[in-house]
């Protein structure tokens, strides 16, 4: 089973109903799988921090949701997570493809992408990096359980060793 199939299964098994997303080459197969699955309502956001508001509203309306994006975009959510999700105890689940590390060609992705685990730690957002495809479903389920039971943000970083990496156009 691919990492995408496992992630979809993990989201379904934890009752995720809404997916907010911002497209990127690496995360797009997961986004497309969610869009093709009737279990999910998908919402395209123009900026990642807007997803924090969308998903907070979903939670207040009785639904669970998750953000699918890449790591450089996740950095845009820090203020919304720190000023809305955390003080209001609104859960947030991010399934995030990591840029800026193995296989990265774009220097602009390195600053936040390479340092993303530490940046998340600095803003008190718990996180876990998934390095192999063997247990993606379990990791998604565990991250969702943590986010929703504690009503706090949790980010699952999908490493390029799982997702593959974006190659430079020649």
Give residue ranges: language-model regions:
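Thiamine diphosphate
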Residues: 1-170
């Amino acid at each position: 089973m691919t990492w995408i199939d496992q992630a979809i299964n993990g989201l379904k098994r934890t009752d995720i109903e809404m997916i907010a997303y911002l497209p990127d080459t690496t995360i797009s197969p997961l986004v497309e799988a969610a869009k093709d699955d009737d279990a999910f309502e998908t919402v395209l956001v123009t900026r990642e921090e807007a997803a924090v508001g969308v998903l907070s509203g979903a939670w207040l309306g009785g639904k669970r949701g998750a953000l699918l994006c890449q790591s450089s975009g996740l950095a845009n959510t820090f203020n919304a997570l720190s000023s809305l999700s955390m003080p209001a105890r609104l859960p947030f689940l991010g399934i995030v493809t990591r840029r800026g590390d193995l296989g990265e060609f774009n220097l602009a992705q390195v600053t936040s992408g390479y340092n993303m685990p530490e940046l998340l730690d600095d803003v008190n957002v718990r996180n876990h990096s998934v390095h192999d495809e063997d247990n993606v479903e379990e990791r998604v389920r565990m991250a969702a359980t943590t986010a929703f039971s504690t009503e706090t943000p949790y980010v699952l970083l999908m490493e390029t060793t799982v997702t593959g990496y974006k190659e430079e156009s020649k």
